């Protein structure tokens, strides 16, 4: 996958994704993270592997988030966005990837994590079904999405305040 990512980046994938997000008035860094976290939960449920940060977040989600940051701060380019904001965007990207991937995987019968827990509990003599494990994971995944959304909406609020003081 890395050669394909390199080719896509060479031909402007990052720039085009940032341009698209800049044009969407409703797109903010926080909202983008919420949507991405929900997307990762869904892919985890379906058992789809995106291989995480290097092939997906860095070349696609991060430039889109920076584009949303540019729109929030009224910056013509990423160089105009404060460096601390860029670092916070990287952290938010990592958080949304990790929250969605980790908890989303526990909602699928075909993911190794849930099968490992099932195997260990069965080996220890507990009577448990894979379905029960998935059912217990649903509230935890829901809580992670809600708390992640709160975290990302607070990030948006903070960015709006910073943008208002810098203009």
Predicted regions and their residues:
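Juxtamembrane/transmembrane-helix boundary motifs in multi-pass membrane proteins
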Residues: 23-28, 85, 127-132
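Hydrophobic core segments of alpha-helical transmembrane domains in multi-pass membrane transport
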Residues: 2-5, 36-44, 114-120, 136-153
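Membrane-embedded alpha-helical segments and adjacent helix-loop junctions characteristic
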Residues: 1-62
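Alpha-helical membrane segments and immediately flanking helix-loop junctions
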Residues: 35-118
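Juxtamembrane and boundary regions of transmembrane helices in multi-pass small-molecule transporters
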Residues: 49, 53, 121-167
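A broad structural signal for alpha-helix termini and local helix breaks/kinks
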Residues: 25, 68, 72, 124-125
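Short polybasic/polar patches that bind polyanions
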Residues: 9, 66, 122
């Amino acid at each position: 996958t890395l050669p394909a990512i390199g080719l896509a980046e060479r031909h402007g994938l990052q720039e085009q994704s940032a341009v698209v997000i800049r044009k969407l008035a409703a797109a903010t860094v926080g909202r983008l993270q919420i949507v991405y976290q929900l997307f990762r939960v869904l892919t985890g449920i379906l058992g789809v592997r995106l291989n995480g940060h290097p092939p997906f977040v860095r070349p696609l989600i991060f430039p889109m988030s920076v584009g949303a940051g540019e729109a929030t701060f009224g910056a013509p380019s990423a160089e105009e966005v404060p460096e601390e904001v860029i670092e916070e965007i990287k952290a938010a990207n990592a958080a949304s990837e990790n929250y969605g991937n980790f908890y989303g995987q526990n909602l699928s019968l075909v993911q190794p994590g849930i099968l490992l827990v099932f195997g260990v509990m069965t080996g220890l003599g507990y009577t448990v079904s894979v379905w029960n494990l998935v059912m217990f994971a649903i509230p935890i995944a829901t809580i992670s999405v809600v708390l992640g959304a709160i975290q990302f909406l607070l990030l948006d609020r903070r960015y709006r305040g910073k943008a208002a003081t810098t203009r």
